[in-house]
């Protein structure tokens, strides 16, 4: 056991986590040079295309150190995005230490901090590594000072390496062996294994990635899942080297996979504990805290026949992505679908893209909303994440919106732009500290503003240099109202949104004008209105197409023409009563893109 090292690689987006893991795999001979591909561990196509890591992946390597001993390194490559920070905390639960990778050119960024603090809270040993020292703009001295100054861990003798060219990779491996502690646990005790991750394989059923805390799990053992009490047989156990490699047993301190032919999707939930069916452990390990979704949106299949396959797809995805929450929803405009909870907008985009690619579905998304706390006049408190569930205005005593604490790191030349943006988003400044060339800003912002397009706007006002991380702190009373869109006097539930009172006029007008462009002309006039309660605040009309009914009259009496025109008028009136207007897909998307 003293030769096992479990660690995660944590870093800000694009500081070279995945490339560093590629080098470690190559150095330890996990894959031959022929099998190496850039970003070996980013197994999804989306990950490769966008160049981001979404799922944490684990690898087991053997490394012969300079002291002549062979060490088993289990490491987990983690995502860097704010939206996936829970993936990071999950990976850390399986480790004793973490490599904090910092780009020697960019320096410390917000996500570096956030992930590092997560690790320190879990009593991890954090080992700083300065990456990209081959770049002309690399300044390892300055960055080492920054790490000590902002993060507060020793970095004077941090390892310097370049994952791209392979300089210093040996040193990284030596530091891992020297500085990261070996796992603790009782090899003789009853089995306790923590499920770090699970995914569904259509041939093998559920594949679970586990970390053995105590005891030994052998192939063919009968084990039970502690939360459900179900018993299974361990058909295959093994490790990823990154290829799936079967072994006969997983010992205390090791990280590996287990396949037990579990067919029901929620058979082995992430964060659960496995133990032997006979003489097992009495109590489960401390799992992970359940992540609460921050953003909700409705997703609807374009053709109603896809509803069942959509549900299956969601079930399979939720096994792999423990933060996904969904419940059935119906909309008069869009039919049957699901209300889905996400961790942020990037997460939402990725999930939608995975559903469309991996499961061949065509989906419509409604505007994302956050959760509001509402105190009704009866004194009851409810939580609403769907604008159409909002009680009538006269039943609401008080509406409270979620506030997040946002930490932004920005080079000082862009400070002004960023402050202007935060003020525009109704932010309250809490703190401002200078660290050398960087400024650390702390703002309290309404989550609804952060979720919509804050990240993109922040990047564009700071030329991509600012970075942010945020977490929910509390609900705060706010003047929020529901804005409805009426088409010919009928509410379109999928277009409703909850917004701040100060924005109704501008948002209402913008929406109405956008709808006017996007809804095709019909044979009768269409009124598009924006309303709050019963008060109409903006309106525009889509004019009818007309047929020239008098074209066939040459000369003759004017009353003949009048008769034909009146007949047309009657027909249009009748049509307007029964005619319904199809709202095209683009109109729903327009709500999301209103700020452009």
UniProtKB/Swiss-Prot annotation:
Any Gene Ontology CC annotation: plasma membrane
Protein topology in the membrane: Peripheral membrane protein
A GO term, aspect molecular function: translation elongation factor activity
Primary localisation category: membrane
UniProt key word Lipoprotein: no
Annotated localization: Cell inner membrane
Keywords, comma-separated and alphabetical: Cell inner membrane, Cell membrane, GTP-binding, Hydrolase, Membrane, Nucleotide-binding, Protein biosynthesis
One record GO biological process: positive regulation of translation
InterPro entries noted in UniProt: EF-4, EFG_III/V, EFG_V-like, EFTu-like_2, G_TR_CS, LepA_C_sf, LepA_CTD, LepA_IV
EC numbers, comma separated: 3.6.5.n1
Signal peptide location: none
Segments forming domain tr-type G: 2-184
Reactions catalysed according to its record: GTP + H2O = GDP + phosphate + H(+)
NCBIfam families the record matches: lepA (TIGR01393), small_GTP (TIGR00231)
Reported function: Required for accurate and efficient protein synthesis under certain stress conditions. May act as a fidelity factor of the translation reaction, by catalyzing a one-codon backward translocation of tRNAs on improperly translocated ribosomes. Back-translocation proceeds from a post-translocation (POST) complex to a pre-translocation (PRE) complex, thus giving elongation factor G a second chance to translocate the tRNAs correctly. Binds to ribosomes in a GTP-dependent manner.
HAMAP family per UniProt: LepA
Record-stated family: Belongs to the TRAFAC class translation factor GTPase superfamily. Classic translation factor GTPase family. LepA subfamily.
Protein name: Elongation factor 4
């Amino acid at each position: 056991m003293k030769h096992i090292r479990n660690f995660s690689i944590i870093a800000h987006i694009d500081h070279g986590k995945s490339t560093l893991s590629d080098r470690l795999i190559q150095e330890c001979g996990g894959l031959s040079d022929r099998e190496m591909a850039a970003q070996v561990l980013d197994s999804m196509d989306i990950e490769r295309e966008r160049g981001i890591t979404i799922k944490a992946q684990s690898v087991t390597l053997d490394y012969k150190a300079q002291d002549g001993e062979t060490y088993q390194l289990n490491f987990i490559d983690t995502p860097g995005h704010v939206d996936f920070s829970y993936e990071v905390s999950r990976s850390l639960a399986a480790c004793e230490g973490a490599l904090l990778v910092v780009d020697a050119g960019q320096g410390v960024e917000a996500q570096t901090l956030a992930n590092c603090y997560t690790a320190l809270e879990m009593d991890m040993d954090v080992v700083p590594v300065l990456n990209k020292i081959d770049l002309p703009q690399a300044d390892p001295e300055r960055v080492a000072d920054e790490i000590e100054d902002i993060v507060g861990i020793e970095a004077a003798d941090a390892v310097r390496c370049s994952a791209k060219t392979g300089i210093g990779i040996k040193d990284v491996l030596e530091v891992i062996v020297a500085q990261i502690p070996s796992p603790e646990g009782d090899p003789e005790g009853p089995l306790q294994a923590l499920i770090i991750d699970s995914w569904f394989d259509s041939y093998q059923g559920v594949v679970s990635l586990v970390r053995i805390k105590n005891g030994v799990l052998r192939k063919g053992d009968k084990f039970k899942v502690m939360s459900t009490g179900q018993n299974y047989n361990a058909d295959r156990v093994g490790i990823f080297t990154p290829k799936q490699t079967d072994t006969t047993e997983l010992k205390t301190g090791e990280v590996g996979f287990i396949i037990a032919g579990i067919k029901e999707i929620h058979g082995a939930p992430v964060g659960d504990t496995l133990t032997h069916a006979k003489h097992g452990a009495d109590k489960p390990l401390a799992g992970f805290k359940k992540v609460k979704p921050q953003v909700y949106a409705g997703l609807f299949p374009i053709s109603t026949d896809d509803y069942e396959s959509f549900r299956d797809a969601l079930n399979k995805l939720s096994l792999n992505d423990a933060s996904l929450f969904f419940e059935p929803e119906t909309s008069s405009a869009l039919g049957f679908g699901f209300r889905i909870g996400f961790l942020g907008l990037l997460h939402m985009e990725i999930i939608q893209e995975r559903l469309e690619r991996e499961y061949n579905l065509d989906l419509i998304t409604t505007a994302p909303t956050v959760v509001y706390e509402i105190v009704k006049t009866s004194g009851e408190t409810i939580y609403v994440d769907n604008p159409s569930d909002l009680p009538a205005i006269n039943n609401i005593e008080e509406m409270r919106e979620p506030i997040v604490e946002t930490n932004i790191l920005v080079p000082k030349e862009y400070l002004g732009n960023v402050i202007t943006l935060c003020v525009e988003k109704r932010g309250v400044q809490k703190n401002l500290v200078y660290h050398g060339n960087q400024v650390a800003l702390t703002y309290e912002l309404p989550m609804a503003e952060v979720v919509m397009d804050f990240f993109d706007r922040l990047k564009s006002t700071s030329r991509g240099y600012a970075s942010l991380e945020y977490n929910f702190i509390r609900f705060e009373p706010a003047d929020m109202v529901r804005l409805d869109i009426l088409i010919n006097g009928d509410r379109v539930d999928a277009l409703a949104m909850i917004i701040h009172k100060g924005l109704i006029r501008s948002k209402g007008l913008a929406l109405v004008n956008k709808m006017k462009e996007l809804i095709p002309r019909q044979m009768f006039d269409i009124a598009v209105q924006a309303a709050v309660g019963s008060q109409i605040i903006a309106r525009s009309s889509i004019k009818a197409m007309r047929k020239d009914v008098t074209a066939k009259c040459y000369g003759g009496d004017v009353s003949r023409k009048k008769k034909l025109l009146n007949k047309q008028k009657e027909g249009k009136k009748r049509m307007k009563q029964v005619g319904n207007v199809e709202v095209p897909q683009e109109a729903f998307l327009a709500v999301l893109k209103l700020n452009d």
